[in-house]
Swiss-Prot record:
Cellular component terms per the entry's GO annotation: cytosolic large ribosomal subunit
Gene: rplL
Protein source organism: Lactobacillus acidophilus (strain ATCC 700396 / NCK56 / N2 / NCFM)
Molecular functions (GO terms): mRNA binding; structural constituent of ribosome
InterPro entries: Ribosomal_bL12, Ribosomal_bL12_C, Ribosomal_bL12_C/ClpS-like, Ribosomal_bL12_oligo, Ribosomal_bL12_oligo_N_sf
UniProt keywords, alphabetically: Ribonucleoprotein, Ribosomal protein
SUBUNIT field: Homodimer. Part of the ribosomal stalk of the 50S ribosomal subunit. Forms a multimeric L10(L12)X complex, where L10 forms an elongated spine to which 2 to 4 L12 dimers bind in a sequential fashion. Binds GTP-bound translation factors.
Alphabetical list of Gene3D superfamilies matching this protein: 3.30.1390.10, Single helix bin
Alphabetical GO biological process terms: translation
Pfam families: Ribosomal_L12 (PF00542), Ribosomal_L12_N (PF16320)
Record's protein name: Large ribosomal subunit protein bL12
Recorded superkingdom: Bacteria
Amino acid sequence: MALDTEKIIEELKGASILELNDLVKAIEDEFDVTAAAPVAAAGAAGAAEAKSSFDVELTEAGQEKVKVIKVVRDITGLGLKDSKDLVDGAPKNVKEGVSEDEANDIKAKLEEVGATVTLK
């Protein structure tokens, strides 16, 4: 039995919306499928987008802790004690939600004085 797609479409053109809705439901039940568009595809596309904000994490202070504390003070505007606590408590975020350029700039400044930095 060959199906003629054009004949089927012509028959469907004469059907009412209610009849077409019943037909869709019957096809879904018979073949165990759904007429809904897949939602997972939208999530996958969102994951591929470029990241717009970064967190700069001080992973390790390195050998020149005093220099790292000075750079952290300059970057964050924190006081000496707070900057020292941040460096001593590594790994900790130095800055959060910054642009890629700013994150790379901060990373370069910290690495220049011997710190290990991770961008997240």
